[in-house]
């Protein structure tokens, strides 16, 4: 399954949750699923599979991943000695495109990925163009000086979509973000039952 390119608010309404990495819009004004029978769908109890699928889709869409990419991260998480769900969330939060987003350089993860792909981002002082790079404690990101004047960067820095997480130390003068410790499940900026995601993949790998 490829990355979805349709209306982002429609996705969030279907999942019943705001996904800050996907869109700055909110479902507050239209909380029911899209479609003629949206209100009835809210009242209908989801099956166990439906719940697992919904939680998995939250991760896919917030972090802008294809099914193949998320499955690959789950495989890596299962190799860890730490709880699989916690490890999966940590791997997602440590992706370069997400860190660029959480630092406040872009309004969404998708926009952050574009900045990385076009080499506007520096990692430890060097230009990079691979959004999936996994950052570690001590890594530092910034935007090239000439790219700080891009409207999307300027606008986001002036109106942050989210508060910066505690694991990312921000230097306002130099416009840099440094990872001081690894993210935890509590740092994920939307409600997620990651154990449901683990169970979804349990018999699919």
UniProtKB/Swiss-Prot annotation:
Q: Please provide the record's keywords in A-Z order.
A: Ribonucleoprotein, Ribosomal protein, RNA-binding, rRNA-binding
Question: Which InterPro entries has this protein been placed in?
Answer: Ribosomal_uS4 (IPR022801), Ribosomal_uS4_bac-type (IPR005709), Ribosomal_uS4_CS (IPR018079), Ribosomal_uS4_N (IPR001912), S4_RNA-bd (IPR002942), S4_RNA-bd_sf (IPR036986)
- Which is an annotated Pfam family here? S4
Of the GO CC terms on this record, one is:
small ribosomal subunit
The SS bond pairs are none
**What protein family does this chain belong to?**
Belongs to the universal ribosomal protein uS4 family.
Give the SMART domains listed for this entry: Ribosomal_S4, S4
Q: Which GO terms describe its biological process?
A: ribosomal small subunit biogenesis; translation
Domain of life from the UniProt record: Bacteria
Free-text function comment from the UniProt entry: One of the primary rRNA binding proteins, it binds directly to 16S rRNA where it nucleates assembly of the body of the 30S subunit. With S5 and S12 plays an important role in translational accuracy.
- State the organism named in the record: Nitrosomonas europaea (strain ATCC 19718 / CIP 103999 / KCTC 2705 / NBRC 14298)
Its Gene Ontology molecular function terms?
A: rRNA binding; structural constituent of ribosome
Q: Which residues form the S4 RNA-binding domain?
A: 94-157
NCBIfam families documented for this protein: PRK05327.1, rpsD_bact
Keyword Ribonucleoprotein applies: yes
Know the name of this protein? Answer: Small ribosomal subunit protein uS4B
Q: How does it assemble?
A: Part of the 30S ribosomal subunit. Contacts protein S5. The interaction surface between S4 and S5 is involved in control of translational fidelity.
